[in-house]
Amino acid sequence: MQGSVTEFLKPRLVDIEQLSLTHAKVILEPLERGFGHTLGNALRRILLSSIPGYAVTEVEIDGILHEYSTKEGIREDIIEILLNLKELAVKVQSKDNVILTLNKSGLGPVTAANIIHDSDVQIIKPQHILCHLTEENASINMRIKVQRGRGYVPASARIHKYDRPIGRLLVDACYSPVENISYNVEAARVEQRTDLDKLILEIETNGTIDPEEAIRRAATILAEQLEAFVDLRDISQPEVKEEKPEFDPVLLRPVDDLELTVRSANCLKAEAIHYIGDLVQRTEVELLKTPNLGKKSLTEIKDVLASRGLSLGMRLENWPPLGFIDK
C-alpha cells in the first residue's frame, strides 16, 4: 500500500451479515481515521429520517366520535387501539395511499390478519394485535387510511390542513421503515498502517424494506446531496452567463447511473431504454407491460426517480436532443 501521503484510502464493503430478514450488519473498511464516525453518523441520520415508507394516518371506527372514547365489549380504549395501529407495518405497491377495512365480531383478539386489503397491499406482521373483544356479541368495524411519506409527522401538524368530519381520527405517522440503526467504529489495519477505521453498521427494519436496500438508498441520498459541493464555485468570481441547456443534464445520463437492481436494469435495456430521459417519458402502464418487470421493480424505479426530482409520464419536447446518439 504505497502511495502519496495525501492520498485517501478507498473503503471496500467487507461483509454483509444477514442476521434475520429484517436485521443485518454491514462492515466497511479501511477508512481514514475519523471517517468511520463521519460516515456512520451521516448514514444513521439519513436512515432514521429520510427513507420513505408507509404509515397509518387516519382511522374511522363505527360508533366512535373522538379518540378519548371507549367502546363496549372492547378491552382497550380508543387511544390504545390507535397506538397499536401506529405500529402496523404495511407495504404497498404502486400507490401513495390506500384505504383498508376491518370488520370483526365475537370473543377474542383482533389482529392485523383481520384487515381486508387487495393484492397491492402486504401486512408484514399479521399476528400484530390491535385490540381484544371481550364479549360474544361485541364487534368492531373500522376504516384505516395508509399513506406514503417520509420521516415523522405528528397528528397535530395535520389538524388544520383540511376540514375533517367528526369521527375521523388522526394518527401520528411514523413513515420510516427503519426501526433501529446503530454504528460502531473499530480499529483497522492495512499493512503497516494501524491508525485506520472499520465502520460496522447494524440496522433493523420493520420488514417493509430489506436492510441492505435501506443502506444503499441512504448512501445514494447522501452522495446526491454532496454533489452540490463538488460543483462549488467561488462566488467572488464574476459569473459567466452560460446558455441554458435544453434538457436537465440528469436526463442525459444513462439509466445505469440510477443504480437499479440487476433485474430492473435488464428489463429497461431490453426495451431500449438507455437514458434517464427515455425512462421518464414512459408511463406506469407502459412499464408494467415490459416482460419480467413487476410492481416491485416499478416501485423501485419510481422511488429512485423521485429522489432526483423526476417522475414517470413526463413530456420532453424535442427529445432526444440534436446530436444525441442513442446507444
From Swiss-Prot:
A GO CC term assigned to this protein in UniProt: DNA-directed RNA polymerase complex
A GO BP annotation: DNA-templated transcription
Keywords (A to Z) from UniProt: DNA-directed RNA polymerase, Nucleotidyltransferase, Transcription, Transferase
Family assignment from sequence similarity: Belongs to the RNA polymerase alpha chain family.
Gene3D superfamilies: 5' to 3' exonuclease, C-terminal subdomain, DNA-directed RNA polymerase, insert domain, RNA polymerase, RBP11-like subunit
Gene source species: Baumannia cicadellinicola subsp. Homalodisca coagulata
HAMAP family recorded: RNApol_bact_RpoA
Sequence segments annotated as region (Alpha C-terminal domain (alpha-CTD)): 247-327
Catalysis: reaction(s): RNA(n) + a ribonucleoside 5'-triphosphate = RNA(n+1) + diphosphate
Record function comment: DNA-dependent RNA polymerase catalyzes the transcription of DNA into RNA using the four ribonucleoside triphosphates as substrates.
MF-aspect GO terms: DNA binding; DNA-directed RNA polymerase activity; protein dimerization activity
Name of this protein: DNA-directed RNA polymerase subunit alpha
Assembly and binders: Homodimer. The RNAP catalytic core consists of 2 alpha, 1 beta, 1 beta' and 1 omega subunit. When a sigma factor is associated with the core the holoenzyme is formed, which can initiate transcription.
Gene designation: rpoA
